[in-house]
Amino acid sequence: MFNLTFLGTSCMKPTKERNQFSLFVSYKNKGILVDCGEGTQRQLKHAGIKLSKINKILITHWHGDHTLGLPGLLQSMSASDYNGTLEIYGPKQTKEKIEHIFKAFEFDNKLNLKIVEVKPG
């Protein structure tokens, strides 16, 4: 059985009641984070979802309201006892953008990443 947890349902501007978009899908012992808007880590904590439950991250597109939480999330996951391979799926240039995140925020990446660029369609 799938379990969906809406972590954010707002658009570019978060409101008092709604964060920028992010969705957590759990299935058995797997966890998929769909997009990572600003404030996603806080919403994960409120929902009782541990970072270690995230196996895959799906980036639908690279607008800020879907990705501004990603640098902090990756840094927190890298600083934690995260085990296994974190798979990140996204559109063209996802690998390049992830590399830019690590350069821009100057932290030591300890994550084993598998980055897959998905073709349209």
Predicted feature descriptions by range:
Residues M1-G121:
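Binuclear metal-dependent hydrolase catalytic cores
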